[in-house]
Amino acid sequence: ITPKKKIENAIQVVGTNGKYSLCTTLREIFETAGYKVNMNISPSLKKFNERYYILGKHISDENLYNLLLEVEKINSGQNITFHEFICACFFLEASRNRSDVNILESGLFFRLDASNVLEKNIASVVMPIGIDHKDFLKKGTIDEIVYEKCSHLLNNSKIIISEQNDEVLKKIKNNINDNSSTKIFFNENFIYKKNKYDFVYKDDFGEITLPLPNLSGDFQISNVSTAICTIRNLK
């Protein structure tokens, strides 16, 4: 069995903005509830080890060194990109350290991303999409970007779409129209309202009043709300 086939209960996160905040919020909620979590982020912020969060901690320098050497040996000099290499490292390490949930942040896009090798997941989350990495595309239009990020999300799962501008939302809906997954949209299936000292999250399961996130920017409320929605829809 290849390492990727051992990655169970995966949540795949795509988009332009807020992916890291979403991933870390999901991780904190799961761990607070007692679940074991593996997480792969891209890029790292301060140290390369941050990319691989395995069962409660970032990979150590020694384990990272040995992992990189092992995957390099397995690759046997074949052509491979940096992102493909580091994704392969995560899949191998995560397959050896089984968790209750695996959180995967996609790279530049998703359709051809090295993280897009799973055959099933428990959710795909689409964070706010904007113009990014135009140099890697033929035209660099928002249509092309939305296609790359959303057209190949896995079927038979859940797709949670975070707060988007109206133009992007229409394009996302067009791209996932034929996807068999259950679709959950901000402003249709879940909402939030900011108050002075707290905010109210509401969806089909009810509403929750929570303190404001200890992070600057109202967009963080949106990120937290998307994380809550994702977890509440994993039933």
Label the model's feature ranges.
Residues P3-K6, T32-E119, I131-G140, E144, ...:
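ATP-dependent carboxylate-amine ligase catalytic core
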Residues I11-V13:
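Hydrophobic anchor at the beta1->P-loop junction of P-loop NTPases
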Residues S21-T25:
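Hydrophobic positions on the alpha1 helix immediately C-terminal to the Walker A/P-loop
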Residues L26, F30, C87-A94, V224-L234:
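Buried hydrophobic packing segments
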Residues V37, L215-A227:
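Short glycine/threonine-rich catalytic loop with a Thr-x-Gly-x-Asp
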Residues N75-N79, L212-D218:
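A short glycine/serine-rich beta->alpha loop
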Residues N97-S106, L112, N121-L210, V224-K235:
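Acidic, Mg2+-coordinating active-site environments of NTP-dependent enzymes
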